[in-house]
Amino acid sequence: MSFRLWGRCIFFFCFLLEAIDSRGGRRGGKGKGKSNLQFAQVAEFSLVQTVLSDNRSAQIITGSHFSQTYRLGYKLLIICKARGDPRPTIKWYKEGAEIQPKASIHYYEKPIENDTIWSKLEVDPATMGDQGVYACVANNPHGVMAKNFKAEYTY
């Protein structure tokens, strides 16, 4: 991927971080548990760069629900599926930083067809620190597309 495209990706994630609302507090309504979600205005899909008339560009075709709620100590699971020609690669980000696998964080990829890939991000056990904005970024030489997920914990 060219330096210019990476620059646009970094700009996109910086823009995403600026959109995070710093006001905390409880979520309205009745129900069990408390929400400490510290962001509010996050777009679900972001088209970073693509030629719209080019059907070969990376496109996220399905994924987990935009707003994820997880219980502390249990598994947080996010799924993303992308298509393009050539088959795109998928990278996972949290708050704009690329996620690196570690003891409690794993991601898996599975090619489905010549032009499609499926990826799953697992955080197990999930903690308060795992709350935030996650992004699945699909990339191929013809374009980049991102799908955001808001994850918040409950007791």
UniProtKB/Swiss-Prot annotation:
<feature type="domain" description="Ig-like C2-type">
    <location>
        <begin position="73"/>
        <end position="154"/>
    </location>
</feature>
<feature type="glycosylation site" description="N-linked (GlcNAc...) asparagine">
    <location>
        <position position="55"/>
    </location>
</feature>
<keyword id="KW-0732">Signal</keyword>
<keyword id="KW-0770">Synapse</keyword>
<feature type="disulfide bond">
    <location>
        <begin position="80"/>
        <end position="136"/>
    </location>
</feature>
<feature type="glycosylation site" description="N-linked (GlcNAc...) asparagine">
    <location>
        <position position="114"/>
    </location>
</feature>
<feature type="signal peptide">
    <location>
        <begin position="1"/>
        <end position="22"/>
    </location>
</feature>
<dbReference type="InterPro" id="IPR050958">
    <property type="entry name" value="Cell_Adh-Cytoskel_Orgn"/>
</dbReference>
<comment type="function">
    <text>Required for the localization of acetylcholine receptors at neuromuscular junctions and for subsequently controlling the response evoked by receptor stimulation.</text>
</comment>
<dbReference type="Pfam" id="PF13927">
    <property type="entry name" value="Ig_3"/>
</dbReference>
<keyword id="KW-0964">Secreted</keyword>
<keyword id="KW-0393">Immunoglobulin domain</keyword>
<dbReference type="InterPro" id="IPR003598">
    <property type="entry name" value="Ig_sub2"/>
</dbReference>
<dbReference type="InterPro" id="IPR003599">
    <property type="entry name" value="Ig_sub"/>
</dbReference>
<dbReference type="GO" id="GO:0031594">
    <property type="term" value="C:neuromuscular junction"/>
</dbReference>
<keyword id="KW-0325">Glycoprotein</keyword>
<dbReference type="GO" id="GO:0005615">
    <property type="term" value="C:extracellular space"/>
</dbReference>
<dbReference type="InterPro" id="IPR007110">
    <property type="entry name" value="Ig-like_dom"/>
</dbReference>
<comment type="subunit">
    <text>Interacts with the non-alpha subunit of nicotinic acetylcholine receptor unc-29 and lev-10 to stabilize the complex formed between unc-29 and lev-10.</text>
</comment>
<dbReference type="InterPro" id="IPR036179">
    <property type="entry name" value="Ig-like_dom_sf"/>
</dbReference>
<protein>
    <recommendedName>
        <fullName>Immunoglobulin domain-containing protein oig-4</fullName>
    </recommendedName>
</protein>
<keyword id="KW-1015">Disulfide bond</keyword>
<dbReference type="InterPro" id="IPR013783">
    <property type="entry name" value="Ig-like_fold"/>
</dbReference>
